[in-house]
């Protein structure tokens, strides 16, 4: 049975009705963040940060809460726009464990339904059972045979979209900014390989026949031949590439493309790890705001340029200081950019090196390197995740 059939059966059993670009009965007990100024939403880890975002936008009872992996990005990439369309918070779990903060938040939210994104390798059946026991909610799993099909299943309910975003399914960076853009469009993201457009992704483009398709990322992420395949799958669409010289510049280009008149609110999140931007997407959508990417120690020049161009007075940083830089209220000077990592070369040692935890200065650096190369508790060739909880090199500071 393929992923689409699995989704249809689960939807029927839970009474879920998917219509238009949203979800019937989507919760009305969410609201944009009203605090103004320059501030940070953070917890001591990615799971707690997602909880703090949820607490900032959602009040009980919730009809739907989305749950995705905090350690395995492929299945989780497309969850942000889906949660945003449903006006639902998005919480994170480890593959085989749920943090006490997440359990407490789910109990506070009193959801009628929890939608788990990804298969049992991303979020185990034990975790699903724990969520059921803690909340009594109906549990729905949205999972295809691979990340590409999962992304298309997360797009169920999108009809007659003006624009669809196509991003790499082999790295997470461009999907972070594109997720907020897709949420603005009440649309979805479709995943592709660099050198081939998966059949399930092509079928989704054919099925929805959007007026526009935006391909986020440069040739290092999505090859020109694949760009042509996207055009072939959407012959009636205006297909364009939105790119920059690196992930930060691409995120800036996405924001300036979708919000040409600026935005009253800007969100900032790490460009090295995916979790904070993912769980922040529903909050950004409620504020109709882009997500710009940053480093731990500074804003890249492209991020500063976008912030100045978009002209926001309220700037919300997702995650702690060890992950994401937060500027002061004073304007920052624009200085020449330092060398930036490209999508094809994540920062840190080469995967072929003899890598261990001593190769990194901080836990955040190690975690970002590990995730950038697509590693997970079940795929950890360097043994950085000793206890299999998805958090690597936990003895390192920060």
Where do the language-model regions lie?
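Calcium-binding acidic motifs and repeat modules
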Residues: 343-387, 394-398
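Extracellular glycan-binding segments that recognize GlcNAc-based cell-wall polysaccharides
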Residues: 3-10, 16, 24-347
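Actinobacteria-biased recognition of intrinsically disordered, low-complexity terminal regions
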Residues: 1-4, 354
């Amino acid at each position: 049975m393929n992923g689409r059939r699995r989704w249809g059966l689960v939807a029927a059993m839970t009474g879920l009705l998917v219509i238009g670009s949203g979800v019937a009965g989507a919760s009305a007990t969410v609201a944009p963040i009203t605090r103004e100024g320059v501030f940070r939403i953070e917890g001591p880890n990615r799971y707690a940060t997602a909880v703090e975002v949820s607490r900032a936008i959602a009040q009980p009872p919730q009809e739907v809460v989305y749950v995705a992996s905090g350690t395995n990005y492929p299945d989780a990439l497309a969850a942000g726009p889906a949660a945003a369309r449903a006006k639902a918070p998005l919480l994170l779990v480890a593959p085989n464990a749920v943090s006490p903060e997440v359990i407490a938040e789910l109990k506070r939210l009193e959801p009628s339904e929890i939608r788990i994104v990804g298969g049992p390798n991303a979020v185990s059946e034990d975790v699903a059972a724990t969520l059921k026991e803690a909340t009594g909610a109906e549990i729905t799993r949205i999972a295809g045979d691979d990340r590409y099909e999962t992304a298309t299943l997360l797009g169920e309910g999108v009809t007659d979209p003006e624009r669809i975003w196509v991003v790499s399914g082999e790295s997470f960076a461009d999907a972070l900014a594109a997720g907020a853009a897709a949420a603005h469009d009440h649309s979805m993201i479709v995943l592709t390989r660099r050198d081939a457009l998966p059949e399930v992704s092509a079928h989704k483009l054919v099925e929805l026949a959007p007026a526009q398709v935006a391909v986020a990322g440069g040739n290092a992420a999505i090859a020109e031949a694949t760009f042509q395949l996207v055009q072939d799958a959407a012959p009636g669409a205006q297909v364009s590439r939105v790119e920059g010289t690196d992930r930060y510049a691409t995120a800036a280009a996405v924001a300036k493309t979708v919000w040409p008149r600026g935005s009253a609110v800007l969100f900032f999140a790490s460009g090295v790890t995916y979790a904070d931007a993912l769980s922040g997407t529903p909050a950004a959508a409620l504020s109709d705001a882009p997500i710009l990417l940053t480093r731990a120690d500074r804003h890249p020049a492209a991020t500063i340029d976008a912030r100045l161009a978009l002209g926001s007075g309220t700037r919300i940083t997702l995650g702690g200081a060890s992950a994401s830089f937060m500027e002061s209220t004073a304007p920052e000077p624009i200085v020449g950019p330092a060398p930036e990592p490209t999508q094809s070369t994540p920062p840190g040692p080469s995967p072929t090196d003899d890598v261990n935890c001593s190769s990194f200065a901080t836990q955040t650096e190690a975690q970002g390197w590990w995730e950038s190369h697509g590693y997970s508790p079940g795929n950890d060739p360097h043994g950085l995740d000793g206890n299999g909880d998805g958090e690597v090199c936990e003895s390192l500071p920060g």
